Amino acid sequence: PHQGRGGAGRFFNFRRMKRILRHILPVILCLPALGGCMKWDYADMEEFAATGPGLFITNEGNFQYGNATLSYYDPATKKVENEVFYRANAMKLGDVAQSMTIHNDLGWIVVNNSHVVFAIDLRTFKEVGRITNLTSPRYIHFVSDEKAYVTQLWDNRIFIVNPRRYEITGYIECPGMTPGSGSTEQMVQYGQYVYVNCWSYQNRLLKIDTRTDRVVDELVVGVQPTSLVLDA
């Protein structure tokens, strides 16, 4: 049937609109998740020289936004320095700073969703090493200068690492867990045994013999135990 000029004009405009949408639609879809689409800027390195005791604060950030940071508070000057890892190393800390432990004059920062543990100098805040290829690390516990345990989310293993060489040396299998449902969290040590709470969708404490790196006992507790401390 004959459409005339009006029909042809409408057909032409529809085709043109399709071309426009093809170009702007990816931009529109990207806007709600701008954090996932943006590129993280890198800064120039700054020099720090912390003196005396201080307080480190890990700022978790937003999951999947890669905006975790590290702050430092100096009690003597009552001054807070924010983003010290970023400023000292000219790179972002990563996605979800879960915890930090101090051992042998180094700060060990566990970055959960970046699958890494960073070791930093406590005075300059500069990175001196890192442990990579972790599943979803939560906490690190030092058994000795050459052995540490790293708990994981979504894994049925606790990783054994060598802090001197920054490498994975083995695994502790957690009974009754699957890779998709496994979860181990905080750790405390009493004598030769390390006790670890099993958090997400779990209800147990595990007892690990540090001489054999094996689970030797377990205790059923309430649902999702989040933390534990040692009564000295």
Q: How would you name each of these model-derived features?
A:
Residues 37-232:
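Predominantly soluble domains enriched in secretory-pathway, periplasmic, or organellar proteins
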Residues 1-35:
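Sec-dependent bacterial lipoprotein signal peptides
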